[in-house]
Amino acid sequence: MEGISIFLKKNNYSDNVFFNLYGDQDLINKEKNKNKISTKFYKIFHSSTVVSDEETPLTAIKNSKDSSMWNAINSQTEFNSNITLSAGNTGVLFVVSRMLLKTIDSVSKPALAGLWPNKKNMNVVLDLGANVECDDKNLVDFSEMGAALYKALFPEDIAKVALLNI
């Protein structure tokens, strides 16, 4: 909730962003009371199950279908969210996302993407260590996805792709 409070202050309490919060409702409410954020900026979705940092993706898929991570990703399949932020288990996040969000037919592996701020604007960095083994097709797919993301974010710029691991 403190992060939402900082975001709202930084953006002059603009109502063009709404937060769907997934997790233990009691814990979220305690934080909400500390930060005094208007409910017009968020909605709480209670999830009683937690994915631990030690949990394997396979175990999480079997046991965590009511977890905050599962529910947050699933909210994107139902078009209730466009963005999911997680500070949790990245391996589980990647597998749950791949399972629920799927990929387009021509893409065999998804890639994690990060926006990397620099002195002039932002860079797009893909994969971020999520895929240990990549073949030529995966690298082409990552290049196309990265270029498409960059063009969507910065339509006036030319997307220049650098391949690090060949």
Please state what every model-predicted region is.
Residues 65-80:
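Short, well-structured alpha-helical segments in soluble
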Residues 1-55, 77, 83, 87-166:
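Anion-binding alpha/beta catalytic cores of soluble intermediary-metabolism enzymes, centered on
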Residues 56-63:
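Short, surface-exposed amphipathic charged segments that create phosphate/polyanion-binding patches used
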